[in-house]
UniProtKB/Swiss-Prot annotation:
The active site is at 37. The gene is bioD. Homodimer. Keywords: ATP-binding, Biotin biosynthesis, Cytoplasm, Ligase, Magnesium, Metal-binding, Nucleotide-binding. Its EC number is 6.3.3.3. This is ATP-dependent dethiobiotin synthetase BioD. Catalyzes a mechanistically unusual reaction, the ATP-dependent insertion of CO2 between the N7 and N8 nitrogen atoms of 7,8-diaminopelargonic acid (DAPA, also called 7,8-diammoniononanoate) to form a ureido ring. Pathway: Cofactor biosynthesis; biotin biosynthesis; biotin from 7,8-diaminononanoate: step 1/2. It is found in: Cytoplasm. One of its GO terms (molecular function) is ATP binding. GO terms for biological process: biotin biosynthetic process.
Length: 224
């Protein structure tokens, strides 16, 4: 059962839309894909990232936990006065979707080192499952540093970063953004997969024109 983890250089970088694009791309390649959101914070019932992914892709997903306040998950649980997420619980939950022909696409919360529980991060979960990563980055001024730090943190933990993806690029990018697009691959040392246009409201049509060769490494499902 292969996993693919999607993390960001921070919050609000376009991680959910990027996850939707990757989910739809894999599904269009004939894979059985399950999108998963580990922890949602600061959203009302029936709202949030996993519901946005379903709206964008038509593929329903699963969510492990949610908290009321828009905070890091461990802080949100603490403030709410509830038991923090336990590492063994989240690993067991993910492994419960066991199916050798399914790809589980896991969207994190914020960045790679955000605490999901009091003593573990998304990086720890990805490492336990031997899962590769896609890092979603902003594209404007300051983004090169954030992307390089995220890839370096992943590499130091023995994680494989398949690529860096720009979560959103404006229709009329400024000079810093245009130069960053040329630099991401050089400074991070991993393939840069381009950037998603700002304001896209659906992934169908857009995904058909994209190519993510690194994802082709996932075993193709048998013909039916």
């Amino acid at each position: 059962m292969p996993f693919l983890f999607v993390s960001g250089t921070g919050t609000g970088v376009g991680k959910t839309f990027s996850t939707a694009v990757l989910v739809r791309y894999l599904a269009d390649q004939g894979h059985d894909v399950l999108p998963v959101k580990l922890v949602q914070t600061g959203e009302l019932p029936g709202e949030g990232d996993i519901f946005n992914i379903e709206r964008l892709t038509g593929i329903a997903g699963e969510e492990f936990a949610r908290f009321k306040d828009p905070l890091a998950p461990n802080l949100a649980a603490r403030r709410e006065g509830v038991e923090p997420i336990q590492f063994d619980q989240i690993i067991s939950w993910l492994r419960g979707f066991d199916d050798p022909d399914r790809i589980i696409v896991v969207e994190g919360a914020g960045g790679l080192l955000v605490r999901l529980g009091e003593d573990f991060t998304l990086a720890d979960v990805a490492s336990a499952l031997n899962a590769p990563l896609v890092i979603v980055t902003s594209t404007g001024l300051g983004s090169l540093n954030a992307a390089e730090l995220s890839v370096e943190a992943a590499n130091r933990r023995g994680l494989t970063v398949l690529g860096v993806l720009g979560g959103s690029i404006p229709q009329n990018p400024d000079l810093a953004t245009m130069l960053n697009l040329e630099e991401f691959e050089r400074v991070t040392g991993v393939p840069f997969w381009g950037a998603l246009p700002e304001g896209l409201s659906r992934v169908e049509g857009f995904v058909e024109k994209q190519s993510f060769p690194a994802l082709d490494a996932f075993k193709k499902p048998p013909a039916r």
